Amino acid sequence: MRSSLFKSGLEKAPHRSLLYALGLTKEEMRRPLIGVVNSANEVVPGHIHLNTIAEAVKAGIRLAGGTPMTFPVIGVCDGLAMNHAGMHFSLVSREIIADSIEIMASAHPFDALVCIPNCDKVVPGMLMAMLRLNIPAVIVSGGPMLAGTTSEGSFDLIDVFEAVGKFKRGAINEDQLEELEENACPGCGSCSGMFTANSMNCLSESVGLGLPGNGTIPAVSAKRVRLAKTAGMRVMDLLEKNIRPRDIVTAKSIENAVTMDMALGCSTNTVLHLPAVFAEAGLPLTLDIFDAVSRKTPNLCKLSPAGKHYLDDLERAGGIPAVMSELAKRGLLHLDVMTATGKTLGENLTDLKARVKNFDVIRAKEPYANEGGIAILRGSLAPDGAVVKQSAVAPAMMRHTGPARVFDSEEAANKAILGGEIKAGDVVVIRYEGPQGGPGMREMLSPTSNIMGMGLGETVALITDGRFSGGTRGAAIGHVSPEAAEGGPIALIRDGDRIEVDIPGRKLDVLVDAAELEARRASVVAPEKVIESPLLRRYASLVKSAAQGAVYKDPAAK
């Protein structure tokens, strides 16, 4: 056993003394020691209930003959960090989470791990650690929040973000805004649409590192507790069979995950997180792969913000297995890949008798589109690529040309949008918000929501070297690479330059002569930013571009 490194033999007598201090018995020490990574806290709605999930996981481990040992990691709520300086720290936390798990599981060599995340950066951070350590492991999330309800129907947190702009233009009153904010988030769980947290939870199930149901069983359901107990038992079986994360994550299962990403209409943040996760296994995932898979994968689901359905609707419609069964019928999935059940994907789908139970939620017969939810754009404005959630773009904005309105920060753009300075036809450009330039690549949910709330969602595009919340909708194009801080073309744009967006043609161009653009370079002055945080200064010096998943540079790499 790996744990023998700190519990077995004469020389480990002092170590056992410390384990006795925990209250462990000799029998508990003899058993496999399983690390339970718990990101519970009292700050994040998606994590407030994770101690309940952790207790269920521990019960499952004990049922199967193991000894659980819990340790914590941080978890940031992107909603609470949005639209202020706190958002600089969100993406940074992904790397901190992965590193902290590596530290704990190396200093204390557990035999296996069960990881319990739920929200945006915690899921990829834990997946990165699982593949980096490559010891038997299962991920079991806290589950999605139920949608909010009023007398007018269901809604979610994004409706509240958009309501700010509606209030500013007089479309709703203060009482209506208050009703929305008090009812949008009815309880624990990751926010109820196909935003980043739920996207990553669904994809952790799709790639095989999470058990069936991990992505969609609601946080408040007893099924979620039973799933957690099962995860605790399953990790013991994986340990016995020596099935490790890199046995599950292969080139085939990566293609499965990206295919599911496109079919589900997931968050554009998956284009940052999946490459970062799979890089830990030495498996490349490029923007070209995303786009190639998107072109051949139908968009079967439009959950909020792209449509009217929520994660609990998807669960009732058959969940991730139902979507996978439909894609399998089309020959779009590899069914021979191993999963955390100890069986192949094909065996899982057969055992589950996976089928679609609601063809309005999962459009298997009449897909929303013949292409996937995400498109990769390139052109003179984004030579290394940019990302758009095309499934959440209005048809009228799939092609758009308009004058640039350029801002060097999110705050400046927000002020202009809410101040009525942005007009129909404009292209809002927000730069110096990339991984290095931000630093931390803040999410532009407030600007995109304010564009919607101000009634400009079908006439205004937004382009940024920052990123978006999974709750963003509209012609919102992010991850523009190279970013402004690296001297990318986005740094050379001026107010009034014509910007051409062609999503079907996968093009993003600034309609200025290349020689003229280059001549501007000498006069470009980056905004002066005083970065007081040593952590953010370190991050800015180490992080790669968004096109490479915004991972750290490897000092050993040539």
From Swiss-Prot:
The cofactor(s) it depends on are: [2Fe-2S] cluster; Mg(2+)
Subunit and partners:
Homodimer.
* Key word Iron-sulfur present: yes
Q: What is this protein called?
A: Dihydroxy-acid dehydratase
State which Enzyme Commission number(s) the record gives.
4.2.1.9
Q: What this chain does, per the record?
A: Functions in the biosynthesis of branched-chain amino acids. Catalyzes the dehydration of (2R,3R)-2,3-dihydroxy-3-methylpentanoate (2,3-dihydroxy-3-methylvalerate) into 2-oxo-3-methylpentanoate (2-oxo-3-methylvalerate) and of (2R)-2,3-dihydroxy-3-methylbutanoate (2,3-dihydroxyisovalerate) into 2-oxo-3-methylbutanoate (2-oxoisovalerate), the penultimate precursor to L-isoleucine and L-valine, respectively.
The chemistry this enzyme catalyses reads: (2R)-2,3-dihydroxy-3-methylbutanoate = 3-methyl-2-oxobutanoate + H2O; (2R,3R)-2,3-dihydroxy-3-methylpentanoate = (S)-3-methyl-2-oxopentanoate + H2O
N6-carboxylysine-modified residues are: 121
Any one GO CC term of this protein is: cytosol
Q: Where is the active site?
A: 469 (proton acceptor)
Matching entries from PANTHER family are given as: D-XYLONATE DEHYDRATASE (PTHR43661), D-XYLONATE DEHYDRATASE YAGF-RELATED (PTHR43661:SF3)
- Indicate the family of this protein: Belongs to the IlvD/Edd family.
Gene Ontology biological-process annotations: isoleucine biosynthetic process; L-valine biosynthetic process
- Top-level taxon: Bacteria
Residue sites binding [2Fe-2S] cluster per the record:
119, 191
Q: What pathway or pathways are given for this protein in its record?
A: Amino-acid biosynthesis; L-isoleucine biosynthesis; L-isoleucine from 2-oxobutanoate: step 3/4; Amino-acid biosynthesis; L-valine biosynthesis; L-valine from pyruvate: step 3/4
Q: Which Gene Ontology molecular function entries are recorded, alphabetically?
A: 2 iron, 2 sulfur cluster binding; dihydroxy-acid dehydratase activity; magnesium ion binding
Sequence positions that bind Mg(2+): 78, 120-121, 443
Per the UniProt record, one Pfam family is: ILVD_EDD_N
